[in-house]
Regions:
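Membrane-embedded and interfacial regions of multi-pass energy-transducing membrane proteins
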Residues: 2-475
Length: 475
């Protein structure tokens, strides 16, 4: 008997054809409609965006060492002079880091990469509902990210990733290219949301009711609702910004009777729900990992499922907490603050149910499980720091400080990136017919320690500026 036949007899999968080797050549990948291949291409693309934005983050940090000692764009004398950036260069690196990390990495990372790969298989479907639309969304992601990159070489971008007016109207940098890139990325996000929503609604296997779906699919469903309803608001806002720069239509520019605060309302009406586009899919991944590696049925399945939908719906009602210092009426601020605290309830439901699932479970400390536990730890810190920003009395002091930077990074990077890595370590061996690395938990602990060393000092730095005003004086 031939060697291949022996392997087939013993293992049953030797030399079998899979989605990676079924066809060869770059064209087979460029024009593929296979959801798994599209997910792999998304994973490669967002990884590139992660490393590029991460490089900008490291580079802008050197500004704290060599404050304003080098001429922008030139090499000064000395081996380390290249890393010395001016204040202007700092603004550009800060903006590019935020824009690429948010629009090109965090938003599409878990839903578009992991979601594309596992969603049809979890449903028992052959593919997503609209395979061609799925491929189109990936190419829109490439074009949108390309426009952001083009802004890098065409005057760069120094407005901050939020594109706040009126400065974004007046800046001589590549604002139009960057906003158009974000506009295209919005279409990519909408197409993904439509595809997933229709797929989950219409292509579930026979007998798979709503409350038999994996919790990861519930999180993708809630995320898709946000993508479809909120992203068009951002797209229209960015188009208005471009028209304001080109035609001076007087929407956001106060010189022509516009209102810059209106831009903030439009932007955050999308961007706060977008926070849940970033974190909800990661929560779904963690729900799967906790149940599998605790070797228990998930505790409170229905509560976790409905909490995803509740977070998605409440996320549309809290955008104003980003604008407590913008001149809103005190009554509006109180309302937004109260609703913001309400959002913490379904988030806490998820965390406590994860802990209850782990309680008395036969926990297997594999790499994915370690990432899931790290997620709970980091997301817990991010959630606790968020309470200070939801309260009016403390947000006034913490606004625009490193405290906000720490909160955002604990939730987005400590949450989304950790969940993405946990999901990749969990599902990738199944696709490659390989085993998990035994040194994975050690590597995770190294990453966790480095992340803490990098981000936690920002909490202290954000508090120090107003420490005197926060002290309790004993009478």
């Amino acid at each position: 008997m031939a060697t291949a036949d022996v392997r087939q007899e013993l293992f049953g999968h030797a030399d079998q054809t899979n989605f990676l080797n079924c066809s060869k050549g770059i064209k087979s990948w460029m024009f593929t409609l296979d959801h798994k291949r599209i997910g792999i291409m998304y994973l490669i693309g967002v990884t590139f965006a992660l490393f590029l934005a991460g490089f900008f983050a490291l580079w802008l940090r050197t500004h704290l060492w060599y404050h304003g000692t080098a001429i922008e764009g030139e090499m000064a004398a000395g081996s380390d002079a290249f890393f010395r950036v001016t204040d202007i260069a700092y603004n550009k690196l800060f903006t590019l880091h935020g824009a690429i990390m948010v629009f090109s990495f965090i938003i599409p990372s878990v839903p578009a990469a992991l979601g594309n790969i596992v969603l049809p298989m979890m449903l028992g479907a052959k593919d997503v509902a609209f395979p061609r639309l799925n491929l189109a969304s990936f190419y829109l992601w490439i074009f949108g990210t390309g426009f952001l990159m083009f802004a890098l070489v065409n005057g760069s971008l120094d407005t901050g990733w939020t594109f706040y007016t009126p400065y974004s109207i007046q800046s001589s940098t590549g604002v139009i290219y960057a906003t158009f890139g974000a506009f295209i990325l919005g279409f990519s996000s909408i197409f993904t949301g439509i595809n997933f929503l229709v797929t989950i609604n219409t292509m579930r296997a026979k007998g798979q009711t709503w409350f038999r779906m994996p919790l990861f699919l519930w999180s993708l469903y809630a995320t898709s609702i946000i993508q479809i309803l909120a992203t068009p608001v951002l797209g229209i806002t960015l188009l208005l910004l471009i028209c304001e720069r080109v035609m001076h239509i007087g929407i956001f520019d106060p010189v022509y009777g516009g209102d810059p605060v209106l831009f903030q309302h439009f932007f955050w009406f999308y961007s706060h729900p977008a926070v849940y586009i970033m974190i909800l899919p990661g929560m779904g991944v963690i729900s799967e990992l906790i149940a599998i590696y605790s070797q228990k049925k998930i505790f409170g399945y229905s509560f976790i499922a409905f909490s995803s939908v509740a977070i998605a719906l409440l996320g549309f009602l809290v955008w104003g907490h980003h604008m407590f210092t913008s001149g809103q009426s005190p009554l509006v601020n109180v309302v937004f603050s109260a609703i913001t605290f309400t959002v913490a309830i379904p988030s806490a439901v998820k965390v406590f149910n994860w802990l209850a699932t782990m309680y008395k479970g036969s926990i297997v400390f594999t790499t994915p499980m370690c990432y899931a536990m790290a997620f709970i730890f980091l997301f817990g810190i991010g959630g606790l720091t968020g309470l200070f920003l939801a309260a009016l009395s403390t947000d006034i002091h913490f606004h625009d400080t490193y405290f906000v930077v720490a909160h955002f990074h604990y939730v987005m990077v400590g949450g989304t990136l950790t969940a993405l890595l946990g999901g990749v370590f969990h599902w990738w061996p199944n696709f490659r017919s390989s085993t998990q690395r035994y040194d994975g938990p050690h590597r995770m602990l190294v990453r966790l320690r480095r992340f803490q060393h990098h981000i936690f000092p920002s909490v202290r730095d954000g508090c120090s500026r107003h420490a005197a005003s926060l002290r309790f004086v004993r009478s």
